[in-house]
């Protein structure tokens, strides 16, 4: 049954207890209020699965949300409603978003600074998968690493989401990239 069409108005993928086999994860109802000041309510159209999502369900990630929590770090959706003092977005806008948890739901309420407009060239699945990986690569290479054109960057695990984003960003900056992966097939990505 598609999300949002169940007996409850909103549905979410909840982690109700930590486990090594996802046995503590189940679909269930989600009660969402209206967006408050500076917040937006989104109808989620796609969400991306990241390795930290799985680590959180085992209690092994650096951020440990209180149980129960809705899984998911990033997604793409349509703005349904805006709170007071939100001026950059309007209902109907298609946006990508990132959050500490909560993306695996039919709808989500977030601060407006957690969303960004999506270029028309990206479909929903592509837009859902870029927020966390691209931001992680950017913070690592540009803000923290201060990577410059002409420098050389070694990217271990270049076939994963962050690795792919790091390779693309480093090339865009003008750096020379040396990439590693666990197999030749992955290097050909």
Each model region followed by its residue ranges:
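Short structural boundary motif marking the start of a folded domain
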Residues: 6-13, 40
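Short alpha-helical
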Residues: 20, 49, 62, 102-103, ...
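NAD(P)H dinucleotide-binding glycine-rich loop of Rossmann-like/cofactor-binding domains
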Residues: 24, 43, 55, 94-157
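Conserved hydrophobic/aromatic beta-strand scaffold that supports enzyme active sites
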Residues: 27-32, 76-78, 107-109, 115
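Glycine-rich beta-strand-centered segment in the early N-terminal region that forms part
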Residues: 31-48, 60-102
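Cytochrome P450 core scaffold surrounding the K-helix E-X-X-R motif
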Residues: 51-58
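Short, conserved catalytic or interaction motifs in soluble domains
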Residues: 84, 120, 182
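Mid-domain Rossmann-like dinucleotide-binding core that forms the NAD(H)/NADP(H) cofactor-binding site
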Residues: 131-189
């Amino acid at each position: 049954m598609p999300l949002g069409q169940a007996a409850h108005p909103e549905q979410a993928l909840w982690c109700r207890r930590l486990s090594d086999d996802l046995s503590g994860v189940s679909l269930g109802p989600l009660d969402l209020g209206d967006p408050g000041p500076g917040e937006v309510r989104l109808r989620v159209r796609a969400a991306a699965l990241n390795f930290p999502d799985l680590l959180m369900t085992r209690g092994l990630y650096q951020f440990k949300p209180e149980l129960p929590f809705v899984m998911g770090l990033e997604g793409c959706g349509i703005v349904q409603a805006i709170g007071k003092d939100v001026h950059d977005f309007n209902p109907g806008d298609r946006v990508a978003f990132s959050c500490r948890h909560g993306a695996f739901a039919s709808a989500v309420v977030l601060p407006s600074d957690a969303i960004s407009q999506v270029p028309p060239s990206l479909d929903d699945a592509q837009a859902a998968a870029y927020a966390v990986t691209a931001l992680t690569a950017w913070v690592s290479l540009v803000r923290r690493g201060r990577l410059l054109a002409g420098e050389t960057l070694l990217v271990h695990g270049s076939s994963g989401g962050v690795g792919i984003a790091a390779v693309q960003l480093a090339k865009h900056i003008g750096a020379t990239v040396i990439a590693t992966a666990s197999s030749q097939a992955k290097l050909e990505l």
